[in-house]
Amino acid sequence: SLHRPPGCRHCVGQLRLCDLDTADAVEEMGAEHVPCPVDDIVVDEDNKVVTTPAYMLAQNIAEAASGIEKLVARVLVLTA
């Protein structure tokens, strides 16, 4: 199981497109779900967590790639 710090901000997708049960479960664990399109990221600077909906929303690997590339770039910035 994944551990997320209380109050951690992250995404599982846009509200109208994401799995609402997953978004609700995330919030029940004390995290904040931030709606986000497949090609973007959510950054929690305080907890140094970066998320993208990627496979949760993508219709193909090309759609997921944009968000994944942004995520990797931001993780590298956070670790510098």
From Swiss-Prot:
Catalytic reactions on record: glyoxal + H2O = glycolate + H(+)
PANTHER family membership: ES1 PROTEIN HOMOLOG, MITOCHONDRIAL (PTHR10224), GLYOXALASE ELBB (PTHR10224:SF12)
Quaternary state and interactors: Homodimer.
Enzyme class: lyase
Keyword Cytoplasm: no
Protein name: Putative glyoxalase ElbB
Keywords: Lyase
EC number: 4.2.1.-
Biological role stated in the UniProt entry: Displays glyoxalase activity, catalyzing the conversion of glyoxal to glycolate. However, this apparent glyoxalase activity may reflect a deglycase activity, which could be the primary function of this protein like other DJ-1 superfamily members such as PARK7, YajL, YhbO and HchA. Is not able to use methylglyoxal as substrate.
